[in-house]
Amino acid sequence: MTMFKEAVTFKDVAVVFTEEELGLLDVSQRKLYRDVMLENFRNLLSVGHQLSHRDTFHFQREEKFWIMETATQREGNSGGKIQTELESVPETGPHEEWSCQQIWEQTASELTRPQDSISSSQFSTQGDVPSQVDAGLSIIHIGETPSEHGKCKKFFSDVSILDLHQQLHSGKISHTCNEYRKRFCYSSALCLHQKVHMGEKRYKCDVCSKAFSQNSQLQTHQRIHTGEKPFKCEQCGKSFSRRSGMYVHCKLHTGEKPHICEECGKAFIHNSQLREHQRIHTGEKPFKCYICGKSFHSRSNLNRHSMVHMQEKSFRCDTCSNSFGQRSALNSHCMDHTKEKLYKCEECGRSFTCRQDLCKHQMDHTGDKPYNCNVCGKGFRWSSCLSRHQRVHNGETTFKCDGCGKRFYMNSQGHSHQRAYREEELYKCQKCGKGYISKFNLDLHQRVHTGERPYNCKECGKSFRWASGILRHKRLHTGEKPFKCEECGKRFTENSKLRFHQRIHTGEKPYKCEECGKGFRWASTHLTHQRLHSREKLFQCEDCGKSSEHSSCLQDQQSDHSGEKTSKCEDCGKRYERRLNLDMILSLFLNDI
């Protein structure tokens, strides 16, 4: 047996694993690794190894995860020493550093028997090592040349470890889960995965009793209770409780988006974001609500939806004690308390915290629509609305109702349709109890109770509750009639009036009387007809006291008393005393068409 003549240093007997390889060790293997490292260190101290600054180790209290990193060689190749550090991922407890001398003081009392000490002659070129290494851990033997990987130039102490590492580059996946068919490079990673779907959760949090399948998951979870954030961004100083969170955050500074969707070319910072985005193209909705059966692309959307059923408002404002179902809604609300509203609308006096919100609000008063469709010329306030509108021309639909199969150009329309399909009214007015399928419709309805009329006409000063009302009203001043009937060429100020008019040409009568089966073109005439069956007379003349079923009959009576011709034809401008006379003229005209 060839004996060594030169001094033995700690690097000569150090166990070296990469961070990736150490991440695959289970609890028992990590403990074994720690014991081997300490045993080697004790052996060096026992043979009189001289301490130096380069031999300093960094230990942390309650360490569970050890990483050995070999730093760059700081001295020349001729006899230079290599600095090594034993690091750990911090879990709980404050940081604490022990020097070699302190470790020696802690372990010297254990080295009482002569056989506990070893001499440098006990280390041979064949790599005689303590028995703890038999579990598969490799020692860098004195005089051995480490194995180098050709692609990343990474060095490994053992050829078997190099072979495992090469699987990361080659994509070779040899270990498959029989239940989920998920594949792994390492058998240890497969074992960890199998614990997850087997339901084995041995590690329990002492604070909240939450259980985990891996000890590392428990230690990461405990940072929520301790508030520890050991991973800090060097750019902005922001701290994170997870290393992965810091990596994702750092890409915000670099602008790196390495994960690209092959369907639409959109790029993402994280691979999980790409996978979630791809579900839009595939239509996959793996997260299903067990209450109503509705499915979602992401778990976060399911969690937000679940709050609707539970009526849970877990996010409370500390200033006014108002509660919200989502954190984003709470953050937006808190800005109303903390930020000064410097930007005031001159039209209605409403104030805003930022200029952008003021500019958006002013479009309600001006009716400005800078984004025009190249196909039909329709204008929109926002580019996003124009993009959604263009789907109508392209025939692109993004949402399909599971109940009736109807397709929609916008997800919001589809969700509103499904709520109406299920008669689901999620938003209720606290004043009158009326329910709505969307919060936007509820906000519009509440103006009826508050009397708010934020939209004022500059021509006549008339106020309106909704932007659509003032837009229709402005056409009375301008005389604009943008909606034209293709059958007869007649134009209208509103699209709804055009649709009603087209029923004259199509003969459509969607409103039918349940008593006699008679059909009507409009809901108003249907209601008027129903009063004939109920004998209800709601309209009474103040001059003679006579009651009528129709408001038109009341108007005719009042015209008889006053002699005024109140019924005017929109086509020729001629006036009639009775609405009935005008209707007869119009019917004759339509029969001639």
UniProtKB/Swiss-Prot annotation:
Q: Which InterPro entries match?
A: C2H2-ZF_domain (IPR050752), KRAB (IPR001909), KRAB_dom_sf (IPR036051), Znf_C2H2_sf (IPR036236), Znf_C2H2_type (IPR013087)
UniProt tissue specificity:
Expressed in lung, liver, pancreas and thymus. Lower expression in heart, placenta, spleen, prostate, ovary, small intestine and colon. No expression seen in brain, skeletal muscle, kidney, testis and peripheral blood leukocyte.
Does this UniProt record's set of keywords contain DNA-binding? yes
Q: Where are the zinc fingers (C2H2-type)?
A: 145-169, 175-197, 203-225, 231-253, 259-281, 287-309, 315-337, 343-365, 371-393, 399-421, 427-449, 455-477, 483-505, 511-533, 539-561
Kindly indicate whether the keyword RNA-binding belongs to this entry. Answer: no
Q: Which residues form the KRAB domain?
A: 8-78
Q: Which PROSITE patterns match?
A: KRAB, ZINC_FINGER_C2H2_1, ZINC_FINGER_C2H2_2
Q: Spell out the GO cellular component terms annotated for this protein, sorted alphabetically and separated by semicolons.
A: nucleus
Query: What GO terms describe the biological role, i.e. biological process, of this protein?
Result: regulation of DNA-templated transcription
Which Gene3D superfamilies does the record match to this protein?
Answer: 6.10.140.140, Classic Zinc Finger
Question: Which GO MF terms does the UniProt record name?
Answer: DNA-binding transcription factor activity, RNA polymerase II-specific; RNA polymerase II cis-regulatory region sequence-specific DNA binding; zinc ion binding
Q: Which UniProt keywords apply?
A: DNA-binding, Metal-binding, Nucleus, Repeat, Transcription, Transcription regulation, Zinc, Zinc-finger
> Where in or outside the cell is it found?
Nucleus
| Function, as annotated | May be involved in transcriptional regulation.
Tell me which PANTHER family the record gives. FINGER PUTATIVE TRANSCRIPTION FACTOR FAMILY-RELATED, ZINC FINGER PROTEIN 502
For this chain, the family text in UniProt reads: Belongs to the krueppel C2H2-type zinc-finger protein family.
- According to UniProt, the name of this protein is Zinc finger protein 284
In its UniProt entry, the species of origin is given as: Homo sapiens (Human)
The encoding gene is ZNF284
